[in-house]
């Protein structure tokens, strides 16, 4: 059946009425966006001859997505969050902004409220027998290449089971395990003493994995570490690096991998003096370069709902 009704006056009037496009009240921008999205959906139903059963399967899926609390996870897995980064990269290019550590997705598992320490923070609060010690360190520099004092570097990552604190279904981690924040001094240096993470997979019975199964895709990420870097003198940086050697680096279901964000992992001695769980530890140097404000403003601050806990 190839029924085409999208272009009819009846359907176009319905779209205008459903979104109150030409009516008073409401928010004009919201009307514009919803009208466009609803129009695209209606047209897709026409073009693909989507059946009522398929439409209601989609509606039921949205209910499950909300019940599972996985909308932000699906935003990563569907490529939506990566697409936003592609647009931001293009906007930077159009503005002539070059250099800086590449951005990549934030993901769904940040928790605000970590205590900010000066320069160094040991963030492995809970013991983890299966994870070896790791030191992550580097220098925050500005667009001029000089160290940035007073920058706040936030870091968060999974444990050896692939779970993030605060969201851990086993309840084995305190809220800020493997999460921390440090403020740089005049030398721009930061350091986190932690444990080696592993990658994670989507909850196997969750809505995100349900859709990925239909698409014939896996829902796994390589081992990685997230960062926010904030400074009054530069734009906020949202980035992450992958752990070198992980087999999923170039098969990340969230499309967050970038060539410049795979720093080498080296082995060092002297961990005992640093308060680590063993004398031999892994070391990752990850320098962070910020970019200039645009007309005196930080246009990289994204407003979205995030978990927050008092440290």
Swiss-Prot record:
Keyword presence, RNA-binding: no
Essential cofactor(s): Fe(3+)
PROSITE patterns given in the database record: INTRADIOL_DIOXYGENAS
InterPro entries reported in the protein's UniProt record: Catechol_dOase_N, Cchol_dOase_prob, Intradiol_dOase_C, Intradiol_dOase_core, Intradiol_RC_Dioxygenase
Keyword set, alphabetical order: Aromatic hydrocarbons catabolism, Dioxygenase, Iron, Metal-binding, Oxidoreductase
Record-listed E.C. numbers: 1.13.11.1
Reactions catalysed according to its record: catechol + O2 = cis,cis-muconate + 2 H(+)
Oligomeric and partner information: Homodimer.
Full protein name: Catechol 1,2-dioxygenase 1
Gene that this sequence comes from: catA1
